[in-house]
A protein has these predicted regions:
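GST-like domain detector, emphasizing the conserved glutathione-binding G-site
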Residues: 1-127
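GST-like fold's C-terminal all-alpha helical module
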Residues: 107-156
């Protein structure tokens, strides 16, 4: 049975890109279906037809629908353990899940001030103290993970 990942625009939806990247990195076959975002009621209905939250991404696996990027990644990690999406060691896996949850639910100031838009020209930006604190915390997380777990592969 083919998995179908329903996503928004890859240029604007970092939430959509998370499970897309996990599926690609895991070598898991899937069909990609893109629904335009911010285009009106018809597209909102198309999203609601596949996602109870009315948001993308959503993963369809036969009769199973999973929505929310982190829930999708958890599902595919369980469904395809050979893909190695989570570390095998329980302590390392717990650490990875904790960081994933923090990345998933935190950093509101940074998300607000630096939303994903791959087509926007890059330039100097004045960030709030909260956004700078978010960036500093992300730097701490990444540094810690690379120092502790770099031997495990190229990913944090």
């Amino acid at each position: 049975m083919t998995l179908t990942l329903v996503i928004g625009n890859k240029n604007y939806s970092s939430w959509s890109m998370r499970p897309w990247l996990a599926l690609k990195a895991g070598g898991i076959a899937f069909e990609e279906r893109s629904i335009p975002l911010y285009t009106g009621a018809a597209d909102k209905k198309r999203i609601l037809d596949v996602s109870p939250s009315g948001k993308v991404p959503a993963l369809i696996d036969g009769d199973v629908t999973v929505w929310d990027s982190l829930a999708i990644i958890e599902y595919i990690a369980e469904r395809f353990p050979e893909a190695g999406l989570w570390p095998a060691d329980p302590a390392e896996r717990a650490h990875a899940r904790s960081i994933s949850a923090e990345m998933h639910s935190g950093f509101a100031a940074l998300r607000s001030e630096c939303g994903m838009n791959l087509h926007r020209p890059v330039g100097a930006k004045v960030l709030s103290d909260n956004a700078r604190a978010d960036i500093a915390r992300i730097g701490e997380i990444w540094t810690d993970c690379r120092q502790r777990f770099a031997k495990g592969g190229p990913f944090l």
